Amino acid sequence: RDLTEKHPGEGATIIVHTLEEGTVYKDEEVTITAFLVDHEPVKPAYGYRFDTYGKSVVISGDTRPTQNLIKHAKGVDILVHEAYLPEHFDNVDSPEVAARLKYYHTSADEVGQVARDAGVKLLVLTHLIPANAEQTFLDRVGKYYKGKTIVGSDLMRF
């Protein structure tokens, strides 16, 4: 597009910031903490915790369940977590591909266990596979987590 539309090169500038587990941003209003999750073969992969004015949110990122995620989500106000239904992968992929996908994502049942073990106040499910099974996700999570669960959608506010 730059050749035909003559956009300035500055708009395409990418500045890479390498980070490690720990505080990645802090000011008088918010602290953002990155923590390692397991999304192998992607290494490193991070989840993030946001603490502001006595409230907290954790975003899991793509991950399988890990103790490190549970540790960083302990007692948070909101946990935003990906979830999948195992039978979906079984129905649309080869057994090998399905096994790989299940290895580095978190099933709805596992998300319920993570939320329970972390003692989160509100669980928001996101990055859902498949996207059209809201009640099934709620039922699976609810076997383990008795707190409030919301199936997320774009532009939701809390």
Residue map of PLM features:
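Cap/insert and terminal regions of metallo-dependent hydrolase folds
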Residues: 46-47, 53-58, 64-156
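Binuclear metal-dependent hydrolase catalytic cores
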Residues: 1-58, 138-158
